[in-house]
């Protein structure tokens, strides 16, 4: 009996034009997803590969039932989308689940207006080994030998 040759083909994280199906094109929508944060399904989470940090807005912090004593000190001021200085309330580490993968994330908690509940930035994307595409409205990452994806919601982003 001849031996089978085992060929290992590396999985590639890529996006094709066919994957735009189901999205409204052309668009300039933010990538807005639902993630499980701290054990709760949280909607209106923006994925921003330009953000150097994960941000949680105070409204979400309160909805999750977290208290001021749950925060650790975070004293570096941030700059808002409008260019204003925002002093964080503090920082908190919470689990964020994507599919079956769980990543501990340090959120900077801020009291500022936002149409989003949280912003997931580069640290989360990198720890998950993920690649995002606002054009395709998806986040892709490798898990258990397969490519998994989180699909954004254009209707929520608008």
Which sequence ranges carry the predicted segments?
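Short linear "hotspot" motifs
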Residues: 1-158
